[in-house]
């Protein structure tokens, strides 16, 4: 009976989302205040009904109700309770329910926190989010229902959650990523609502920007956590594969980054209006594209859900309706959008325009590199491969001028400026950059490569000019220590995010150029050397868990003869799913990671091991956290506080 309650809640959600999609928009069109006033209670009703469905699915997993097919496929009596509950979103049906529940969360947040906005604007925004909800609730209810019964027969035990997903990082990675994906629906809804009314002004940008920042922060955290999981869980030391599904999360991140910067121009100068609206449509459209790639069945990926063609066709049709309808409205109304003025050749606006051009170039590279092999294969033209070297080289070319813009842009004034005002600090910074670009790789790693030099240069120029801009802004009217305390959260957020980019670039440059990998065969007492580090194999002991059996290898590491760390790498065999998994062991720090992965046992009682030395790799994720923190500070800037908006 409990599973049926989930079905009833989904059916109720469909009815409420249909009403939300119709009545508020009709009321806004006809100027009917009573119909517009229904938007908020209907949104809260949708959230309540989907919360009931979500809670029911949690309960079914908690009690291992094997009369439900989705529970059978993803749970087992031996599975620990925390993995049992996270299995709710461990496969296709449950992750779709998570998606639409988070959409209801975002919709409710808009309803709750936008009481200062005009009633018509709120009605249109919530109505558009209702339309989005209708499509996804229909999809879940009729093609991907997690409450489908196994009657008349049901097993006494389940098949178990995929062992790759039995990890703490994967408990939080999908919700964070989906919060980012779904969050861009708010920016999309604001953009479409503004297109419908033709009211595209600085107020619209100010309303949209904190919601866009929130979505971008969640997406950043989701990508960072997913990358970290891939690094320590998959056992080969990589952190980004340029996998099509990884790329499908990176593309909306690039579009969202461009949107945040474009919104700042629209808000402050009234420029880039049409372009900003297009970016809002693009960001959410790319989120939907990612959903299609994961669930269409056309991908073979660690991230892809097994799915039948019917589901893929439904998502494709939904994609065409949403994106096609949005672009048709944009084509019809876009010509009516008028920006206040054009940017001068040398101004903050022109810097941000170049920023957007480079971000869109990067997006096109990822888009074409991801989809061309898929399209080529689907057309029956055979298989082609576009691998990591292509993406790495293209991003090196794009990121070099982007880093220079990231440093110079904040120093340039709005509307009009002269380069002579910042010539001296820029020339000095470039001089230091050129020296440091060669010196840092040489002194830190005794080796120089082209990409490590360029990476070091990018890091140095961003950091130096960010610190100079901080000093200039703080001492504009007062002493440094007085002025720095008066800087806005938005300014601190911008600086932290830019420094985060510098840190990530530094981590990528050094880890990719100077990592050392050794595949070794070791018996107890054997040692292997990587640079100044000695890895000594101390043996393997049994390491059994609640749903797996395995072995744990001890590797003692010393540096220049002095003990450094003891690592314990595991090899697990999951008895239900009959899958083997590697659990790497890592000792890390700011300057290097030492990484050990245990392989198979060989004939002569020796073991295969993979050893890594990875310099500065943690800077990649630390930089990502800095970016997210920067976005968070910008989101909570005083001018985005809702009482401030009300006064304005």
Task: Report residues per predicted region.
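Membrane-interface interhelical loops and short amphipathic "cap" helices
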Residues: 1-9, 32-36, 59-93, 145-174, ...
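Contiguous transmembrane helix-bundle modules in multi-pass membrane proteins
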Residues: 1-34, 50-52, 66, 244-254, ...
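A conserved hydrophobic secondary-structure block that centers on an alpha-helix together
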Residues: 11-22, 95-227, 235
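Membrane-interface helix-boundary motifs at transmembrane edges
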Residues: 30-39, 113-125, 197-208, 267-275, ...
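Interfacial and helix-entry/exit segments of alpha-helical transmembrane bundles
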Residues: 39-48, 128-129, 203-225, 270-287, ...
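Transmembrane-helix bundle segments that line or gate the permeation/cavity pathway
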Residues: 50-73, 77-79, 86-111, 139-149, ...
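Extended, hydrophobic alpha-helical segments in both membrane/secreted and soluble proteins
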Residues: 175, 182-192, 204-262, 275, ...
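Soluble non-transmembrane domains of integral membrane proteins
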Residues: 518-610
């Amino acid at each position: 009976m409990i599973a049926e309650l989930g079905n009833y809640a989904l059916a109720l959600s469909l009815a409420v989302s249909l009403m939300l999609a119709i009545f508020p928009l009709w009321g806004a069109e006809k100027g009917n205040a009573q119909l517009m006033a229904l938007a908020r209670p209907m949104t809260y009703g949708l959230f309540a009904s989907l919360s009931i469905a979500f809670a029911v699915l949690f309960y079914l997993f908690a009690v291992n109700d094997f009369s439900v097919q989705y529970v059978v496929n993803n749970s087992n009596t031996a599975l620990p309770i925390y993995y049992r509950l996270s299995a709710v979103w461990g496969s296709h049906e449950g992750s779709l329910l998570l998606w639409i529940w988070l959409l209801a969360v975002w919709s409710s947040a808009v309803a709750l926190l936008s009481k200062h906005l005009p009633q018509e604007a709120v009605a249109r925004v919530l109505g558009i989010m209702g339309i989005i909800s209708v499509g996804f609730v229909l999809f879940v209810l009729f093609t991907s229902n997690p409450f489908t019964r196994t009657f008349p027969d049901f097993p006494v035990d389940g098949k178990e959650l995929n062992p790759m997903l039995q990890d703490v990082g994967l408990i939080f990675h999908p919700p964070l990523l989906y919060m980012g994906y779904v969050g861009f629906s708010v920016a999309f809804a604001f953009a479409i609502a503004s297109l419908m009314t033709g009211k595209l002004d600085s107020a619209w940008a100010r309303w949209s920007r904190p919601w866009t920042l929130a979505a971008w922060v969640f997406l950043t955290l989701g990508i960072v956590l997913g990358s970290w999981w891939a690094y320590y869980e998959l056992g080969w030391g990589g952190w980004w594969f340029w996998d099509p599904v990884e790329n499908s999360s990176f593309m909306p991140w690039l579009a969202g980054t461009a949107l945040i910067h474009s919104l700042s121009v629209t808000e402050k100068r009234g420029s880039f209006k049409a372009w900003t609206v297009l970016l809002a449509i693009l960001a959410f459209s790319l989120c939907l594209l990612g959903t299609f790639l994961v669930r269409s069945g056309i991908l073979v990926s660690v991230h892809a859900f097994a799915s039948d063609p019917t589901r893929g066709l439904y998502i494709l049709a939904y994609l065409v309706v949403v994106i096609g309808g949005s672009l048709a409205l944009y084509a019809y109304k876009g010509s009516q959008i008028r920006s206040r003025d054009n940017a001068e050749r040398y101004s903050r606006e022109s810097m941000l325009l170049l920023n957007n051009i480079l971000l869109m170039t990067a997006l096109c590279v990822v888009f074409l590199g991801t989809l061309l092999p898929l399209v080529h294969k689907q057309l029956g033209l055979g298989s082609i491969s576009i691998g990591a070297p292509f993406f790495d080289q293209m991003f090196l070319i794009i990121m070099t001028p982007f880093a220079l813009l990231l440093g110079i842009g904040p120093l340039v004034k709005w509307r009009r400026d002269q380069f002579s005002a910042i010539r001296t600090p820029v020339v000095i910074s470039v001089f230091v950059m050129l020296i440091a670009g060669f010196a840092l790789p040489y002194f830190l790693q005794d080796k120089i490569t082209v990409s490590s030099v360029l990476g070091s240069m990018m890091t140095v120029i961003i950091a130096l000019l960010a610190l100079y801009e901080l000093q200039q802004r703080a001492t504009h009217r007062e002493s440094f220590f007085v002025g720095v305390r008066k800087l806005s959260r938005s300014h601190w957020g911008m600086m932290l995010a830019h420094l985060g980019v510098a840190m990530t670039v530094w981590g990528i440059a050094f880890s990719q150029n100077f990592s050392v990998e050794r595949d070794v065969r070791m018996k107890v007492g054997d040692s292997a050397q990587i640079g100044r580090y000695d890895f000594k194999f101390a043996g393997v002991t049994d390491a059994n868990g609640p749903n797996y059996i395995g072995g744990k290898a001890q590797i003692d590491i010393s540096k220049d003869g002095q003990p450094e760390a003891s690592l314990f790498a595991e090899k697990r065999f999951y008895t239900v799913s009959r899958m083997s998994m590697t659990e790497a062991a890592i000792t890390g720090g700011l300057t290097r990671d030492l990484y050990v992965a245990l392989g198979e046992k060989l004939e002569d009682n020796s073991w295969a091991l993979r050893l890594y030395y990875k310099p500065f790799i943690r800077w990649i994720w630390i930089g990502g956290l800095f970016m997210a923190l920067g976005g968070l500070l910008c989101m909570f800037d005083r001018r985005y506080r809702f009482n401030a908006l009300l006064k304005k």
